[in-house]
């Protein structure tokens, strides 16, 4: 059976792509067929006649099924701005039903499908829908990435509230230590655990830029426990 996960974050730049790639790389090395998808990407450069985005490139690099780089993204725009604005500039309508079909097509090609959102939970993707609406339509468990920067407690609390209100299942959260220059780091992380109601399923360390392998083993067991079917 294929397991699918939707990765969102507290904001842009919190480390969603890095977390996706860490999970793909580790579980792919365990013999699983894995693919990372970025249905919507904004901020792309034109190279050799094709739009290329750094996040899309990394997700493709860490996927191990036979696909082309452009296959992992359904909508890509050159402008580095909110997708509803980028799509309007390019006269392209982003349709969530089309994205759902795009994602579902990969379920027959891999054991694990990781879908990376764009920006945060309430980023508009068209005139009527936000990232959260796409996640609801996909109806797959959500992983929330939280970076340990100033303001993360407020960001985490608001995003958690919105995720739970949407009715999707929160599979777990990831602490991404993007900096080691934070006042009272231990107290901040303890506060995050209190807000989230659990310890993170993964902690990405600033110095090592990788998670503890033992955490990946726990994550693998959680993913394949089928507890969220």
Give a label for each model feature.
Residues 99, 103-126:
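Switch II (G3) loop of P-loop NTPases
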Residues 126-149:
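Inter-motif core of Ras-like GTPase G domains
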Residues 14-15:
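Conserved glycine(s) of the Walker
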């Amino acid at each position: 059976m294929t397991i699918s996960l939707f990765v969102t974050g507290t904001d842009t730049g919190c480390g969603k792509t890095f977390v996706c790639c860490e999970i793909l790389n580790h579980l792919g090395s365990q013999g699983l067929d894995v693919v990372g998808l970025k249905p919507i990407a904004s901020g792309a450069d034109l190279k050799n006649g094709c739009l290329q985005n750094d996040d899309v490139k990394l997700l493709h690099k860490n996927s191990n099924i036979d696909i082309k780089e452009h296959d992992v993204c359904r909508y890509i725009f050159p402008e580095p701005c909110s997708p509803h604005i980028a799509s309007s500039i390019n006269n392209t309508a982003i349709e969530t039903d089309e994205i759902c079909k795009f994602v579902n097509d990969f379920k027959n090609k891999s054991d694990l499908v990781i879908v990376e959102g764009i920006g945060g939970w309430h980023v508009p993707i068209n005139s009527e829908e936000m990232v959260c609406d796409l996640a609801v339509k996909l109806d797959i468990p959500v992983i929330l990435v939280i970076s340990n920067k100033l303001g993360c407690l407020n960001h985490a609390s608001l995003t958690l509230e919105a995720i739970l209100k949407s009715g999707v299942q929160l599979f777990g959260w990831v602490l991404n230590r993007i900096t080691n220059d934070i006042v009272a780091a231990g107290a901040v992380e303890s506060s995050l655990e209190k807000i989230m109601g659990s310890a993170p399923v993964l902690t990405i360390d600033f110095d090592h830029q990788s998670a503890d392998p033992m955490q990946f083993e726990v994550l693998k067991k959680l993913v394949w426990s089928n507890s969220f079917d």
